Amino acid sequence: MELPLGSDLARLVRVWRALVDHRLKPLELTQTHWVTLHNIYHLPPGQSQIQLAKAIGIEQPSLVRTLDQLEEKGLITRHVCAHDRRAKRIMLTESAEPIIQAVNGVISHTRNEVLFGITPEQVDELALLVARLEKNILALHENQA
């Protein structure tokens, strides 16, 4: 009998996300907020919503609700692009910096706890395997298109 690898990976993502959501609750943020802020922080300033959605790997409409929430919290601003009035550029606010640092601390601490007893070499090997699985899946999608 084959192992249900897809189910195992999906379950791992769910429990990891639930743990991160629980730990970010005191900051009134979620894992989705963190992923979005993390990408905005690490991408060049003034990314469009479309570019950000691509970087995260989601559809733009899925991103809009999260951006609305982050804007309500005063962590980002959105401005109409001068070259394309349909596009919006996303910028972090000054108040986002300490929040991002706090979130990064929570994420780093959580990651260290989750990886307890696992060597850096094992983590590297897992990352390579996950990347290979993703590459194989993307190739299968391309072949079906």
Curated annotation (Swiss-Prot):
Cited InterPro entries: HTH_MarR-typ (IPR000835), MarR/SlyA-like (IPR039422), Tscrpt_reg_MarR-type_CS (IPR023187), Tscrpt_reg_SlyA (IPR023071), WH-like_DNA-bd_sf (IPR036388), WH_DNA-bd_sf (IPR036390)
Heme in keyword set: no
Classification lineage: Bacteria, Pseudomonadati, Pseudomonadota, Gammaproteobacteria, Enterobacterales
Source species of the chain: Pectobacterium carotovorum subsp. carotovorum (strain PC1)
Protein name as annotated: Transcriptional regulator SlyA
DNA-binding region: 49-72
Family, per entry: Belongs to the SlyA family.
KW Transcription (keyword) present: yes
GO biological process: response to stress
Gene (UniProt): slyA
